[in-house]
Amino acid sequence: MENSTGKGTVVLVAFYNKKALGVRYLETALKQAGYHVKNIFYKDFNSVHPKPTTEKELALLRETISACKPVMVGLSVMSSMYLDTVYQVMDSVKQAARAPLLCGGAYATMFPEKLLERGADFVIRSDGEHAIRRLADALVNQTDYQAIPSLAYKEGDQIQVNEIGDILDNVDGYGLPAIQCMDACLIENDALVPGDPQLDTRSYEVIASRGCPFTCSYCCCVNLRRMLPKGVKGVRSRSVKSVIEELRKAKEICKNIVFVHFYDEIFPNIPGWVEEFAAEYDKYIHLPFTIWSHPKMVKLDMLTTLKKVGLTEVIMGIQSGSERVRKDVFHRYETQEDVINAVANIQKAGVFWGTFDLMLQHPFETINDLKESYYLVKRLPGKYELQLHGLNFLPGTDIVDMAIDQGYYTQEELEKIMYAPMDDQFGAYWKQNTTQESQMWYKMIYCWQFKKYRKRLEKFEKNPLAYVGEIEKCYAEAQKLTKLRYLYKKGRVFLYRETKFRG
């Protein structure tokens, strides 16, 4: 419905993410400036079988936007993987309202021209909290917006891209994200569900920092960092006070929370920060939590401190067991011993679960590289979970140019891959299209995470092609065990909460 107070309504649309921290921070910024915000969470996330949008869902979107009579409509375009849905939504927004169409998010930051050429009126790059308020005010007051830092727009046939600016080094200044969006809905499965879909969540997602200190070639974070103005740190951590305040409010509002997931690229390990965080978390939050980290950042003292107050899982990228691939292809400079020591630290600290990512079977990898991944996994101590997947070529990442320069793809071939329909992109992420020998090494890596197969695997590794049937059988069993282990893991985390924090 049309807002009857304040300066007007801004509609924000988030794609394939019911929690969508970006639009939640923007809601806070806009409300502080006197705007009513309508948040539309468009589609839920499914990494294995993502669902394209339907005409019924687009019709529901148009009806919702039309009823708001918005000042402008903002789309959070974080990834290229769902651009087919974004473009259909852009067309629907143009049909539903005369309001200007704005895009922001990681993909929009890196490729403002593409979205402007596709029909967006404006793009905001990098942090949007200040720029979106200034743009909304300019539109409402019919004043000039051309000098707004971080703004991109079309002037006639020319695209103007302003320098990124007016962003905070101290991100506490942006306030807290909207834990409960007061005027929100979810559009999914051809239906509109009123209310904030986060309210019923059992796991709450929070970031304690923005940015990443590393230079991984397959990730856009390094290039987003390079765009920041001089004097703005590449990694900006929130204060402990700000993080704890958000979590305390989340516990009050989202009554079903049993778990906290820190979605930082790398969980902060600033001297003094972890100790202060642990003390405050232990005092007020009392929930098990998981973090993402990196072999260079997994320190025993940090993990021991965090484990005492609820850390139950560390998710860490190994990405390849080949030092050549890690260093020369992925631009990751940890050694084999760094990886093994990081895993050992997780075990020594007594953290319940370690989950490690590997990106395998891509053009840069030889069969010997794949074997090195197997033999590194064999050296990892203790129990752990492996997440094996492929390599996605994402626009704006350094590895795209590397693949072209080294002759694996032409520019045209990669453009087709990177901008394929969503189903094709996610299918490629999980697809295994390699030689039989490669398949056997891949499946042996997968099976090694289960102790019951290890003696057999040591026999198979001598000549995998002589044991194809047996490896396939172990792999099929291991996939079933993975599903059972998931249920065990969730149950143990719940019991951990009940016994540690309520016992």
Feature annotation, model-predicted:
Residues V10, L101, I148-P149, V260, ...:
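Hydrophobic/aromatic residues located in beta-strands of well-ordered beta-sheets
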Residues M1-V13, K31-Q32, L58-S66, P194, ...:
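Radical SAM enzyme core and accessory elements
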Residues N39-Y42, C103, I291, F356, ...:
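A structural preference for short, hydrophobic beta-strand core positions in alpha/beta folds
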Residues N46, P112, G156, F214, ...:
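Flexible glycine/acidic-rich beta-alpha junction loops that bind and position SAM and/or redox cofactors
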